[in-house]
Amino acid sequence: MRLPYSWLREVVAVGASGWDVTPGELEQTLLRIGHEVEEVIPLGPVDGPVTVGRVADIEELTGYKKPIRACAVDIGDRQYREIICGATNFAVGDLVVVALPGATLPGGFTISARKAYGRNSDGMICSAAELNLGADHSGILVLPPGAAEPGADGAGVLGLDDVVFHLAITPDRGYCMSVRGLARELACAYDLDFVDPASNSRVPPLPIEGPVWPLTVQPETGVRRFALRPVIGIDPAAVSPWWLQRRLLLCGIRATCPAVDVTNYVMLELGHPMHAHDRNRISGTLGVRFARSGETAVTLDGIERKLDTADVLIVDDAATAAIGGVMGAASTEVRADSTDVLLEAAIWDPAAVSRTQRRLHLPSEAARRYERTVDPAISVAALDRCARLLADIAGGEVSPTLTDWRGDPPCDDWSPPPIRMGVDVPDRIAGVAYPQGTTARRLAQIGAVVTHDGDTLTVTPPSWRPDLRQPADLVEEVLRLEGLEVIPSVLPPAPAGRGLTAGQQRRRTIGRSLALSGYVEILPTPFLPAGVFDLWGLEADDSRRMTTRVLNPLEADRPQLATTLLPALLEALVRNVSRGLVDVALFAIAQVVQPTEQTRGVGLIPVDRRPTDDEIAMLDASLPRQPQHVAAVLAGLREPRGPWGPGRPVEAADAFEAVRIIARASRVDVTLRPAQYLPWHPGRCAQVFVGESSVGHAGQLHPAVIERSGLPKGTCAVELNLDAIPCSAPLPAPRVSPYPAVFQDVSLVVAADIPAQAVADAVRAGAGDLLEDIALFDVFTGPQIGEHRKSLTFALRFRAPDRTLTEDDASAARDAAVQSAAERVGAVLRG
């Protein structure tokens, strides 16, 4: 949020005459009381002749690809300057800001007289962005009539001695998205008296008489208050004054017409969003209801929006008038000929507004405030302030007719529930002995009503602070206003010698092993892309479809927590390939969330006491399983091309090798067995076992999944459940035999569907302890072997720890290995 220093200072000074601080001091104060200042932006700087001019004549130059205009500009004392300009949003008679030759604009841009498009240009007509008044590059800055006379100092008229604060307001402090809220915070920080700009002394109530506007509100829409007041007979040609336009501009809002400008101004001033409807375009009664299935609405930006049944609408008898809390509809838009305006101030459900604006991708200034909560007590005050401003600027008459729906039954007290707290709780939590009365004084400064009952305070939070729900929230207010810097910085003693846990050590070892093998680690998103399991073709009862849904997700189309790491990895792979990185090997180690049929939600448990054992057990039972997984994906070439050859494409064996890398890092033995498990290819998928426990799958992805997901041909993947793999104790260093090894090869013919791993296991079991290593180095199929059969050739390395082996010793062990393979998998020695 952007706010000018001058506006903040003006509102604070109402209750503290003569108060003044520098922008730098104000920045430090805001930071001290917990508000993040992203940037402090000085306006300008402008050096040299910058003046106000009136456009006296415009000549359209033809023959160019874009509009070019030669403008005669009066800069005072009937001095005319010819200036070439490409903007078209101004006309003869308009007041503009002119930078004359010799002026230097923000960014070090120096203006000089020059020849352009065959004419002499003696200066530049400036936009707001060129003067550092905002980011609007769309056209020239046109001042409203009467803002100044030609020849007036441009820097003075524009107020370029001001500073704009750019703040990041946290979600729990929606009241600070206004001058009212931030000025109150500054008054608290400096111990000043504060005059609320929404109080009756600043906004005297307007008279109320006559019939109310017909209104119906559907139950359960979450609307807490809905107020309406007409303003009749405004001048459609009226223009907002420069002081108002300037403040809107510095806050990042473009001025349009008085009816819209005053609603934006009051929103920035008091923090209450409002909307202006064309009263004459409303048909019949107004109503608030949920959208119907298949219903659409055209919003103010001219786009037809498809609505959801959870969206809340304002409707009349003929059409939708607004999407509640998000944006108005085109049907009741205030237009250039509008003379009668119906002002609306409502309180919408924050969660509903947040869901709607995210789903429709409509992040408006109003929605940003509504989703952080808005003060319901000032709806009518904001309405009256807006109506008075509009009548003052555009003429017309404020109608005494007021509609103020406050719920059913009507609500008269908007304050959150009272909170009881010991008066010394902030002192005990902070470890600071605050002066007597500090807690009550600070809580009263933020607007709370504080009563004493011995050593206990009863605190009723103000209507604009629904975030104050428990004693801890009140403690936070006292501590931040007193200054966090006074709290002693004491670190708790850390027990020495624990180091990393076995699980942490294993995770680090696996990550290093995969990285050394050419894989790149990513941090996967914890959310599932929409429809990913449909792309994979998973059955409806597949356990991976049983997900945990987040009620308020970061992205409306990704509300489900991931039950597998593969979707995030495959998305990253596609993104890399689309940017030209076609040879990709990625991995991730992260938790997944896997609820079961027994996973159940629980209600809120009080936080002002320790939970009972039963409550803790209930909380534990409600948590879904969150095992740690490791997953990897590969595509393109596994071995790069070069002078040595064309390279080797990724194949299923590379995924199997990734499993072995993980197994070696985990110090466990794994077994790979053929499996059919989507999204893997049924003939190139292996189920991974540690002992007899299944821990995951690896192999090449199914061709249909690859095609539907836009993946490179032959993409391979592996995913293992690390929590299902036991953490092994560190292995002792192996004893290296000083005796020479004996090398022999063996070729075995087996059925084509027998896994090579099963044959290797049989050979190892038969060869006994003398077999030091076995490696498959050739697979052969052909008519010589027979139909549906294959030949596997293994390199065997024999070695004894206590003697030199003879060829006869090695051959005997080899023969025993062949016999074992024959008995276990039906292998035949190839002649």
UniProtKB/Swiss-Prot annotation:
Q: Name one GO molecular function term.
A: tRNA binding
Residues involved in Mg(2+) binding: D467, D473, E476, E477
Cofactor(s) required, per the database record: Mg(2+)
Tell me where in this chain the B5 domain is found.
414-489
Query: What does the UniProt entry say about where the protein is found?
Result: Cytoplasm
The main location class comes to cytoplasm
The alphabetized UniProt keywords are: Aminoacyl-tRNA synthetase, ATP-binding, Cytoplasm, Ligase, Magnesium, Metal-binding, Nucleotide-binding, Protein biosynthesis, RNA-binding, tRNA-binding
EC identifiers of the protein: 6.1.1.20
Q: Which GO terms describe its cellular component?
A: phenylalanine-tRNA ligase complex
Key word Nucleotide-binding present: yes
Which reaction is recorded as catalysed by this protein?
tRNA(Phe) + L-phenylalanine + ATP = L-phenylalanyl-tRNA(Phe) + AMP + diphosphate + H(+)
Record text on subunit structure and interactions: Tetramer of two alpha and two beta subunits.
Q: What's the protein called, per UniProt?
A: Phenylalanine--tRNA ligase beta subunit
Could you tell me which species this protein originates from?
A: Mycobacterium bovis (strain ATCC BAA-935 / AF2122/97)
